[in-house]
């Protein structure tokens, strides 16, 4: 059964609230001009390189982008439920240097190739959201599929409408267009709206975020320590005792899952034993009734 809302997704809830709150703060404080990046003049000649570290953390400059980003973050909550909040937070933090630094650096390189027309990088956590979208695309299966079919029929009107059915059916010829969609299609539609909101500036962080997410999943993204994880206390979890071996770390990592599976196994065994007990009791009652019927017949004889 699907869980509604943001249940069991505290990091996604925090990301959603931060996206909306930071976008509102940009408007209230009237500091939108400090959030985005223009290669000229912000980086050259003003040398405002601090924008490379703040453009993704500043929020969005208009309500449309903030709305689509919040909707996309809400759809991506299933990734946190599948991974757990510790791995989810680790992914965001470990990919943050790449999603923050690569888009402006690529913008600097692409600017001369586009005859200095590509000069603007919109602010907001677009790259992080699309890195999460890559995990959603690769790791979350669809629940259902549906088809949308359209048809354009051209029928030839007959001179006499009282003719037989064979004469009327000859003119009916149709062209069909069928689209096969799934429950994940709405998520991709929201992501496309966000990527195309400030074309072509928003396309760059969206593409970089997707590539970073795919590279992280393929384990080709250079990270300082592949075994590093966010501390358990940072996400509200308790640190389990370490056993000092690799197997001990694996047991610590999946301790919660093991306890959950054990609880489900105990509940299933109890239900099975209850069903078996009720079935044996019912069979005993039927046997006693059968024996009682035989004794009554013998007494009648």
Curated annotation (Swiss-Prot):
GO terms for molecular function: transferase activity. It is an enzyme of class 2 (transferase). Its EC number is 2.3.2.27. The keyword Transcription regulation does not apply. Pathway: Protein modification; protein ubiquitination. Component of the DSC E3 ubiquitin ligase complex which is required for the srbA transcriptional activator proteolytic cleavage to release the soluble transcription factor from the membrane in low oxygen or sterol conditions. Required for growth during hypoxia and triazole drug susceptibility, as well as for virulence in a murine model of invasive pulmonary aspergillosis (IPA). One of its GO terms (cellular component) is endoplasmic reticulum membrane. It is found in: Endoplasmic reticulum membrane. Residues 268-284 have a biased composition (Low complexity). The lineage of its organism: Eukaryota, Fungi, Dikarya, Ascomycota, Pezizomycotina. Keywords: Endoplasmic reticulum, Membrane, Transferase, Transmembrane, Transmembrane helix, Ubl conjugation pathway. Residues 268-301 are annotated as: Disordered. It comes from Aspergillus fumigatus (strain ATCC MYA-4609 / CBS 101355 / FGSC A1100 / Af293). Disruption phenotype: Impairs growth on solid media under hypoxia and leads to triazole susceptibility. Impairs virulence in a murine model of invasive pulmonary aspergillosis (IPA). This is DSC E3 ubiquitin ligase complex subunit B.
């Amino acid at each position: 059964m699907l869980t509604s809302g943001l249940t069991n997704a505290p990091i996604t809830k925090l990301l959603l609230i931060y996206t909306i709150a930071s976008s509102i703060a940009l408007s209230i404080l009237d500091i939108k001009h400090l959030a985005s990046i223009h290669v000229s003049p912000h980086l050259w000649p003003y040398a405002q390189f601090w924008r490379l570290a703040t453009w993704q953390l500043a929020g969005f400059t208009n309500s449309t982008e903030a709305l689509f980003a919040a909707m996309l973050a809400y759809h991506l909550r299933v990734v946190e439920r599948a991974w757990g909040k510790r791995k989810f937070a680790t992914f965001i933090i470990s990919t943050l240097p790449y999603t923050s630094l690569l888009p402006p650096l690529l913008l600097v390189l692409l600017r001369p190739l586009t005859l200095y027309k590509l000069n603007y990088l919109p602010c907001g956590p677009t790259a992080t959201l699309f890195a999460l979208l890559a995990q959603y695309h690769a790791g979350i299966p669809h629940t259902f599929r549906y088809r949308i079919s359209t048809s354009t029929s051209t029928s030839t009107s007959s001179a006499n409408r009282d003719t037989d059915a064979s004469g009327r059916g000859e003119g009916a010829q149709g062209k069909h267009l069928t689209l096969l969609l799934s429950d994940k299609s709405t998520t991709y539609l929201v992501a496309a709206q966000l990527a195309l909101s400030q074309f072509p500036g928003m396309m760059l962080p969206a593409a970089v975020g997707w590539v970073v997410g795919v590279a992280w999943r393929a384990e080709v993204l250079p990270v300082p320590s592949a075994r590093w994880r966010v501390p358990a206390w940072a996400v509200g979890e308790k640190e389990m005792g370490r056993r000092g071996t690799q197997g001990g770390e694996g047991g610590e990592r999946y301790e919660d899952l093991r306890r959950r599976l054990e609880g489900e196994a105990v509940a299933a065994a109890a239900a099975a034993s209850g069903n078996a007990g009720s079935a044996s009791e019912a069979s005993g009652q039927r046997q006693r009734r059968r024996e009682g019927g035989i004794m009554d017949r013998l007494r009648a004889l």
